[in-house]
C-alpha cells in the first residue's frame, strides 16, 4: 500500500511507516492511500465471522493489514491485540451498539480511558508509535492541538512510553472543567500542556506552522497525533465496519451514519469505508452553530470563519471554523486533482464549488447529507432522550441524534449515530437539560481535585517553538 499527498501532482509514493510519525506531507498536503482497497462480498463475510468469533481487535487487524504492507502481519495483529483490550476499554465488545429509537442506533465509542471516541484511534496510534520508534532506535516529540478530547486521549495513550514526549496546545478557557482536569491533572514528565491565547483553529495553525518548518521538524523529531495523521483515520475505519456488522444480518443490508463533526476527521473515515465498498448508504454531517461544513454541503461554499467569529458553544469539541481534514474529501471530490486542491486550500478564507460540476457528486456519488444544531436543540434532545428513553447523551452526540432525526425522511436505512463522549465530560449542559449530574465512572474518582500542570502562552508559533526547544534540551 502506497500513500500520496493531496497536493502532489506527481503522486510520489510513500509507505505507511514513512508517514506514520510525521503527519503532514512535506508540501503541506495530507496523506491518503494511492488507491482505496476494494473489499469483496467474501471479505465482508470473513470480517463478520471474525468480529463475531474473535472480537474487535481481530477485526481491526484484518482491516488494518489492507493499509499496512511494510509491517509484518503478525506484528500488526499483536499491535491491535494490545490496543483493544480490557481493562483499557470497559467492555469486551470495545464498541457496543444499542438501539435508541426505531432504526436509530448509538455506536458507543467512549468506553476507553478518557471517555471519548478519540481513544479508539489514540490507543492504536500509541502502539504503532512505540513499535516503530523501537525498531528505528529513535525518539519523538508529538505536537498536537485539541478542542477538548484529542489532547487527553493522546496523553493517556502516550504516557509512560519510552522515547515519546507530548506537547499539546489547548484554547485557553474553551474546554469544560472535566476536560481540563483530565489533561492538566496528568502528572508525567513527558507530558506538556500548553494553554494558548486563542481558539482551536489558532492551535491547529501553530501545529501546521511548526510542521511546515522542515528544519525544526527534523531537528526536534516533531510528530503528529491530530487527525491530519493518516493512522488516526485508519483506526476509525474499523468501527464503521464493526457497527455495520453489529446491526445487519447479511452483506446486502446498508446502514447510514450520523457523525457529529467539526474537523471532518471522523466522518472522513466513513467516506473511505464507503469508497472501499462496505454497504454504507448516507453519511450525515452533524455540526453545531459553527456550521462551516453544513454550509458547504448545502451550498457548495466553504467559508472559513475568523477566530473572532468562531462561536463558543455547549458542544465545544466542534467549535471549529476550519476543518483540517476536509482537504482529503475535496481531493477525492475533484477527481484527485492535486494542483487544484492545493490552490483551493491556499485560500485562507475558503472557496466555493457552488458552480463546479463536481459539487453535486458530494451528495449523489458520495452520499453526504448535512444539518446543524443549536444549544436549544441539544438541550431538548438530551432532555427528551433522558425522560422518554432513560438514555443520557453528551451534547455532541445529541447534535448527531438531532440532525439524524431531522433528516430521517431522506434516509431509508438504519442510522448509527457515532457517540462522541460520555455525558460526564459536559456536566453543565447535562444538568441544564435533565436537572441531574451525570454519573461519574469510578475510574475518574478524584480527577477534579488533582493538581494542574499547564503553561500559558500567547498565540505565537515562535514562542511555542522556543518552549519545545528549551524543554527538549532539558
Residue ranges and their predicted role:
Residues 1-474:
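PLP-dependent amino-acid enzyme catalytic core
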Amino acid at each position: 500500500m502506497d500513500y500520496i499527498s493531496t497536493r502532489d501532482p506527481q503522486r510520489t509514493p510513500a509507505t505507511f511507516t514513512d508517514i506514520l510519525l510525521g503527519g503532514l506531507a512535506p508540501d503541506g498536503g495530507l496523506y491518503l492511500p494511492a488507491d482505496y482497497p476494494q473489499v469483496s462480498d467474501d471479505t465482508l463475510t470473513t470480517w463478520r465471522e471474525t468480529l463475531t468469533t474473535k472480537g474487535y481487535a481481530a477485526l481491526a487487524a484484518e482491516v488494518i493489514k489492507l493499509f499496512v504492507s511494510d509491517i509484518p502481519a503478525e506484528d500488526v495483529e499483536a499491535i491491535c491485540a494490545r490496543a483493544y483490550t480490557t481493562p483499557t476499554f470497559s467492555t469486551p465488545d470495545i464498541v457496543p451498539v444499542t438501539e435508541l429509537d426505531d432504526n436509530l442506533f448509538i455506536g458507543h465509542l467512549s468506553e476507553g480511558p478518557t471517555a471519548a471516541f478519540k481513544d479508539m484511534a489514540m490507543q492504536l496510534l500509541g502502539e504503532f508509535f512505540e513499535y516503530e520508534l523501537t525498531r528505528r532506535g529513535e525518539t519523538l516529540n508529538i505536537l498536537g492541538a485539541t478542542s477538548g478530547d484529542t489532547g487527553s486521549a493522546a496523553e493517556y495513550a502516550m504516557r509512560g512510553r519510552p522515547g515519546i514526549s507530548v506537547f499539546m496546545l489547548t484554547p485557553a478557557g474553551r474546554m469544560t472543567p472535566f476536560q481540563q482536569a483530565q489533561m492538566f491533572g496528568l502528572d508525567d514528565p513527558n507530558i506538556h500542556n500548553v494553554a494558548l491565547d486563542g481558539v482551536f483553529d489558532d492551535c491547529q495553525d501553530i501545529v501546521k506552522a511548526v510542521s511546515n518548518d522542515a528544519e525544526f521538524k527534523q531537528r526536534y523529531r516533531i510528530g503528529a497525533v491530530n487527525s491530519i495523521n493518516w493512522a488516526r483515520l485508519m483506526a476509525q475505519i474499523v468501527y464503521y465496519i464493526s457497527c455495520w456488522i453489529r446491526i445487519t444480518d447479511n452483506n446486502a443490508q446498508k446502514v447510514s451514519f450520523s457523525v457529529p463533526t467539526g474537523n471532518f476527521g471522523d466522518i472522513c473515515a466513513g467516506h473511505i469505508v464507503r469508497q472501499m465498498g462496505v454497504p454504507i448508504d448516507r453519511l450525515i454531517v452533524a455540526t453545531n452553530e459553527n456550521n462551516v461544513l453544513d454550509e458547504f454541503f448545502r451550498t457548495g461554499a466553504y467559508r472559513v470563519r475568523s477566530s473572532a467569529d468562531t462561536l463558543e458553544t455547549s458542544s465545544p469539541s466542534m467549535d471549529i471554523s476550519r476543518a483540517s481534514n476536509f482537504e482529503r474529501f475535496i481531493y477525492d471530490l475533484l477527481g484527485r486533482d492535486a494542483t487544484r486542491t492545493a490552490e483551493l486550500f491556499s485560500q485562507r478564507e475558503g472557496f466555493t464549488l457552488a458552480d463546479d460540476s463536481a459539487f453535486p457528486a458530494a451528495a449523489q456519488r458520495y452520499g453526504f447529507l448535512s444539518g446543524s444544531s443549536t444549544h436549544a436543540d441539544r438541550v431538548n434532545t438530551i432532555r427528551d432522550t433522558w425522560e422518554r428513553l432513560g438514555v443520557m447523551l453528551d451534547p455532541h452526540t445529541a447534535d448527531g441524534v438531532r440532525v439524524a432525526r431531522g433528516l430521517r425522511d431522506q434516509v431509508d436505512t438504519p442510522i448509527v449515530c457515532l457517540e462522541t463522549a460520555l455525558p460526564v465530560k459536559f456536566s453543565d449542559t447535562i444538568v441544564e437539560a435533565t436537572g441531574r449530574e451525570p454519573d461519574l465512572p469510578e475510574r475518574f474518582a478524584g480527577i477534579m481535585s488533582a493538581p494542574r500542570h499547564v503553561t500559558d502562552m500567547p498565540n505565537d508559533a515562535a514562542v511555542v517553538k522556543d518552549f519545545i526547544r528549551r524543554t527538549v534540551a532539558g
